[in-house]
Amino acid sequence: MPEINKVIKKDAFELLSELEDKSIDLIITDPPWLTTSLDFDKQDLNFLKLFKEYKRVLKDDGWFFLIGTVEMACAAIQSGFKRKFEYIWYKDISVSQTKTTIHPLLKHELIFAFYKPELDKVSRLTFNRKALRTYGHKKYKIQKSSTRKSGEFGSKSGRDVLDKNGNFQNYYKENNGYREGNSILKIYSKQNMPSDERVDHPTQKPIKLLNILIRGYSNEGDTVLDTFSGSGVLAESATLNKRNFYSCDINEKYVKIGNVRVTKSKLKKKKKVFGGYEYA
């Protein structure tokens, strides 16, 4: 097995060849899109072969999140994965374009969620609903029309409930300012990224984006995989959230960046925020 909890210098297939079958709980990756003039987009990459290896190392009840294009998602389906849903990362700033560009300003990226057809029950997939909630919204209180408690009897279409003493009670649902997570993720792009988060990588993803995926779709102690470390954001998020990880990159510069982020993340302390904790 390769070294764990450290970004290592290998290509994707070399790392995957060293991993055992069904040894990974969650895969999150943002592979080269092969659509730009950036150096890492000039490599020859067989997505069908890559995703078949992902399917081999992923546990039957594990998630695979792909940050990429529709064409890449089709390759994932062709390799044997089943699509469950997708997130839209809605950016605060559009990607720049030239006068010859023949499409609108792009303000989003797609994040496809896949699972393995070998899974006997979809309900076995990890889904931490509370971890996906957002806080700081307006509080509210609404009357529950169908609430029942043990030993109590309903009346008036369920709006009032008769307790054991024969008194009618109204029951309410209270919300302390949270909203359930949805499929539109409004998170800053690199242009507006905090200076202490930004590293020297052209397509860096925000830590908040990875935190959502890791907290929502894995548990503490699980093992996460990313075969294209890039800016090292997955390695940092996994460390902060007490997940193990395997991660690699063929570029020595990005390997060093990732490991520096891991080292710094171990020194960060938690601070209280709405509904839980965030890292300072």
Q: Where do the language-model regions lie?
A:
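Short strand-turn motif at the edge of the Rossmann-like AdoMet-binding core
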Residues: 31-32, 68-71, 228
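Mobile active-site "lid"/loop adjacent to the S-adenosyl-L-methionine
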Residues: 31-49, 185
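Class I S-adenosyl-L-methionine
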Residues: 19-21, 26-28, 38, 84-280
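Short His-Asn-centered micro-motif
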Residues: 10, 58, 66-69, 187, ...
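Extreme N-terminal starter segment of soluble prokaryotic enzymes
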Residues: 3-7
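Conserved Class I SAM-dependent methyltransferase catalytic core
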Residues: 43-94, 114
